[in-house]
């Protein structure tokens, strides 16, 4: 790793000046670029998250530093996914499930990076297709109602075999990495982030017998809604799904690549972020 990773692209999601993090991000950008230079890396800034505009820059980089929260990391991972480049997150924000380090730990991380003392985690990603339009999802693909009234009927197939019809507000198809995101809020299960599976979690289903379903990633899935619906990617991008138009979902041939500290332990992250084992007074 230390012989080939020399150019670091720095992702910063555009932030309005009224955002509470605006000033902190502006200061951090300059500090990070200076630190990368001091540590012997070439670097450049990407702050548009516009894949077409930044394609040549993405090809130039060996890895990407994502400055912000999990939303910034997700946007960067989707944008770089087809280029098969690793990313790592420097947390400036709230929860930071995906982040490798805090800002004050970046210098040590970069030094470990140069000495090949970090690890590469490869996670399952989703590849979706509607008609001729293809896309990737890192956390989840959601089929959601386009209008507030009524329920949305979604027929689900594994290959050509129908296995369920969901009737409710929609359906989450999550990756293991995304199982602690929207899926968890919808009472879906936590699945180890390095597992090879899909998690299907209904949203406010009309039937009280519907429960989340975990399927092996060897399945190719497709879904049809009885009326026009929205397909939401990682909570950041949307596509229209016409009535009875199939949405195809399968395991992406390219993995999501995250650089993390060697000491990172998934169960420790769950315990710290979700406050497992803490007393109710501490949680408040």
UniProtKB/Swiss-Prot annotation:
In short, the EC number is: 2.7.1.23
Any single GO BP term: NADP biosynthetic process
Kindly list the positions annotated as binding NAD(+). 70-71, 139-140, 167, 169, 177, 180-185, 236
What reaction does this catalyse? NAD(+) + ATP = ADP + NADP(+) + H(+)
Top EC class for this record: transferase
GO CC, alphabetical: cytoplasm
Q: Name the residues annotated as catalytic in the UniProt entry.
A: 70 (proton acceptor)
Q: Which GO terms describe its molecular function?
A: ATP binding; metal ion binding; NAD binding; NAD+ kinase activity
The alphabetized UniProt keywords are: ATP-binding, Cytoplasm, Kinase, NAD, NADP, Nucleotide-binding, Transferase
Task: Tell me, in one coarse class, where this protein mainly resides.
Answer: cytoplasm
**Where does this polypeptide localize?**
Cytoplasm
Cofactor(s) of this protein: a divalent metal cation
Family named by the database record = Belongs to the NAD kinase family.
Q: By its UniProt entry, which HAMAP family does this protein fall under?
A: NAD_kinase
Q: Briefly, what is this protein's role?
A: Involved in the regulation of the intracellular balance of NAD and NADP, and is a key enzyme in the biosynthesis of NADP. Catalyzes specifically the phosphorylation on 2'-hydroxyl of the adenosine moiety of NAD to yield NADP.
Kindly provide the name given to this protein in its UniProt entry: NAD kinase
Q: Which organism is it from?
A: Helicobacter pylori (strain ATCC 700392 / 26695) (Campylobacter pylori)
Gene (UniProt): nadK
């Amino acid at each position: 790793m230390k012989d080939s990773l020399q150019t670091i692209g720095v992702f910063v999601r555009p932030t309005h000046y009224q955002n509470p993090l605006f000033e902190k991000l502006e200061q951090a950008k300059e500090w990070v670029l200076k630190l990368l230079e001091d540590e012997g890396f070439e670097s450049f800034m990407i702050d548009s998250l516009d894949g077409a505009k930044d394609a040549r820059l993405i090809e130039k980089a060996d890895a990407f530093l994502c400055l912000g929260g999990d939303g910034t990391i997700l946007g960067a991972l989707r944008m770089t996914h087809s280029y098969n480049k690793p990313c790592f997150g420097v947390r400036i924000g709230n929860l930071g499930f995906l982040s490798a380090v805090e800002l004050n730990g970046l210098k040590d991380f970069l030094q470990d990076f140069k000495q090949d003392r970090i690890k590469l985690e490869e996670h399952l990603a989703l590849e979706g297709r509607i008609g001729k339009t293809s896309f990737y999802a890192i956390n989840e693909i959601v089929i959601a109602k386009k209008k507030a009234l009524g329920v949305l009927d979604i027929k689900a197939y594994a290959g050509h075999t129908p296995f369920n019809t969901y009737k409710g507000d929609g359906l989450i198809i999550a990756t293991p990495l995304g199982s602690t995101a929207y899926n968890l809020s919808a009472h879906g299960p936590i699945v180890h982030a390095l597992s090879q599976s899909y998690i299907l979690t209904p949203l406010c289903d009309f039937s009280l017998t519907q429960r989340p379903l975990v399927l092996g990633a060897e399945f190719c899935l497709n879904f049809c809604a009885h009326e026009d619906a929205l397909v939401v990617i990682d909570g950041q991008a949307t596509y229209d799904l016409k009535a009875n138009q199939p949405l195809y979902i399968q395991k992406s041939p390219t993995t999501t690549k995250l650089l993390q500290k060697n000491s990172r332990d998934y169960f420790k992250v769950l315990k710290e972020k979700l406050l497992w084992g803490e007393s109710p007074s501490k949680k408040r």
